[in-house]
């Protein structure tokens, strides 16, 4: 049995020793030449500076009311409870200035940083328009704050999802995907 395994490993090493062929160039539907590297953008490097991200949809441009409404519909179809939270620009991201890392007052929350809840969770919410009106009210009250919509599952007793629904007008943290890579 050992001799059989050795023979297989020898065959594998001979296959690996073959010289690499140049990447296969193919034409896409539009007639442009593509290679493996351009298909998966595998040669790009993530920009580590000024590339802040929030939660689920933070890589996308700001969501429209229609897109938010579709997400809220999905939340309500799954019987999850929507809830709005907001935070000032300087408190929205985890950092040494606004997080207590260790000590007697440190909680067991993921980064020991909380956003302020807007009113109470919307337990009786049945329509996306109710959530959109609360987003507008929160935006009117705190125009310079980040506002996110989170949803909770009462059965599993966990937060299911969270995404930004409002960025402050002065925010410069969003970048196009092409600008996030070098």
From Swiss-Prot:
One of its GO terms (cellular component) is chloroplast. Its main location: plastid. Residues 1-41 form a transit peptide. Pfam families: RuBisCO_small. It is found in: Plastid, Chloroplast. GO terms for molecular function: ribulose-bisphosphate carboxylase activity. Gene3D superfamilies: Ribulose bisphosphate carboxylase, small subunit. InterPro entries: RuBisCO_ssu (IPR024681), RuBisCO_ssu_dom (IPR000894), RuBisCO_ssu_sf (IPR036385). Keywords: Calvin cycle, Carbon dioxide fixation, Chloroplast, Photorespiration, Photosynthesis, Plastid, Transit peptide. GO terms for biological process: photorespiration; reductive pentose-phosphate cycle. The basic functional RuBisCO is composed of a large chain homodimer in a 'head-to-tail' conformation. In form I RuBisCO this homodimer is arranged in a barrel-like tetramer with the small subunits forming a tetrameric 'cap' on each end of the 'barrel'. RuBisCO catalyzes two reactions: the carboxylation of D-ribulose 1,5-bisphosphate, the primary event in carbon dioxide fixation, as well as the oxidative fragmentation of the pentose substrate. Both reactions occur simultaneously and in competition at the same active site. Although the small subunit is not catalytic it is essential for maximal activity. Heterohexadecamer of 8 large and 8 small subunits. Belongs to the RuBisCO small chain family. This is Ribulose bisphosphate carboxylase small subunit, chloroplastic 3. It comes from Acetabularia acetabulum.
């Amino acid at each position: 049995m050992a001799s059989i395994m050795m023979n297989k490993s020898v065959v594998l090493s001979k296959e690996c020793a073959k010289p690499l062929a140049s990447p296969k160039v193919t034409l896409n539907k539009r007639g442009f030449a593509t290679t493996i590297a351009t298909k998966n953008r595998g040669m790009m490097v993530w920009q580590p500076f000024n590339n802040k991200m929030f939660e689920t949809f933070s890589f996308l441009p700001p969501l429209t009311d229609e897109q938010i409404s579709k997400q809220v519909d999905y939340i309500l179809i799954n019987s999850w409870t929507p809830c709005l939270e907001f935070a000032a620009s300087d408190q929205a991201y985890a950092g040494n200035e606004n997080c207590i890392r260790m000590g007697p007052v440190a909680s067991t929350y993921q980064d020991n940083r909380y956003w302020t809840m807007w009113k109470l969770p919307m337990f009786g919410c049945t329509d996306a328009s109710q959530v959109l009106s609360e987003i507008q009210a929160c935006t009117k009250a705190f125009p310079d704050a980040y506002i996110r919509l989170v949803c909770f599952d009462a059965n599993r007793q966990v937060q299911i999802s969270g995404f930004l629904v409002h960025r402050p007008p002065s925010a410069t943290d969003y970048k196009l995907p092409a600008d996030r890579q070098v």
